[in-house]
Amino acid sequence: MAETTNPYQGGPGTGISLPPYFKPTKYVKNNNFFYPGLEEIGPDEMRISFVGSCPWPPRRNQAGTSIMVELGNGDLFFFDLGNGSVHNIIAMGVPPALINDIFITHLHADHYADLPYMLPFTAMAGRYKPLRVTGPSGRTPRLGTQAMVNKMREMLCWHLEEFDNLPVGDGFEVNVTEFDFREENGICYERNGVTVRHWPRSHGKDGASAYRLDWNGLSFVWTGDGRPDELTVKYSQGVDVFVTEMQNDLAQLMSMKSGFPPPLYNYIIDTHHTPHFAAGYLFKEINPRIGMATHMEYEPALDAEVIAGIRTHWDGLFVFGAPDVQVVNVTKDAVWTREAVLPELGNASRLTPAQVLKAAELDEIPDVFEFPPVNFPREEQRIEYLREIEIDPSKYTPKDVQRDLVLEMPPVRFNVRQMMAAQQKMQDES
């Protein structure tokens, strides 16, 4: 029997691929599952959640690709925002108003399809400041992130105008940071001790990029889609968490499962994607503390074969970033992975007073916070006849619960300090 050596020099009971730092961080409350709302992130911790992991077709347990990165300084980032990912983000306990700072790798719809869906609703839910979106240019202006956002707002014209009879402030505005897709290791975000860099990827068409986030001695790379390339190896050196997209190079088997003709399946991989053998090669060349793969049709029956392909190059720590929602906690001395336990209903979490300030981009706690005024009143958006044909509510509402209708948006204000004191009292009594 061949002798197997743990690359991390582990002893008995450590396995053949697990490092000594593969252990719960000191902030982890449950070693087996992540329960949203029951575990605060540590001040020196990074938490990465795969809130979407699938390209096509979408599955009940795999939304379109999106990776949520939380930092111990309170910052929150989203790398891609694929179809259905907002459902998981809300189920993870993130108030809708805090879904911001979105970094798009490229403009295939499975990487940003939830952007038009969430724009008006998160503004209505308290995000009264502009949405911040970062992404690559295209070969021509009409193919870049800014052009996509412009056309998206045109597409949403009816929705945005109708919702303007609600207090949304500047929430419908989108501040786009579009960088030159050709730029190598350029900085597209630098704030609050966080730096995000980017570099180009080979993915069928010009305008695809990878990202690297660095903060407090911790780092994360998301390759986005693309062929395995030398720039990714170069700019991912020293990273803690390296996440590559991956497609199973198993055309015959995938054809049986999904109906793709093998030549078409192979062509898509060979011109657009990273096969599982190449994922292992990238891990070996980069040597991250943990290598992960997502943006894949997760087939449990093929796990062993895919891992075997990865192991032809990489004998270190590897975990799938699929299905939804895999959670990774990272500190300088520990890396730990779990699956999130999410509620079926996924009701949106209420903003705490501190989160209200964050969403409103306020530095100090005001005595009173007031909702922004309505920009386009309801009565200016409908012809009088349609209002007149509404059925009188007294005909369908039981008498004991009838109330005066609110037909004009009233001013809404609340005392932030009183709210904070009341919440603290509830916590003290619980």
PLM region descriptions:
Residues 358-363:
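Protein-protein interaction and targeting regions used for scaffolding, dimerization, and localization
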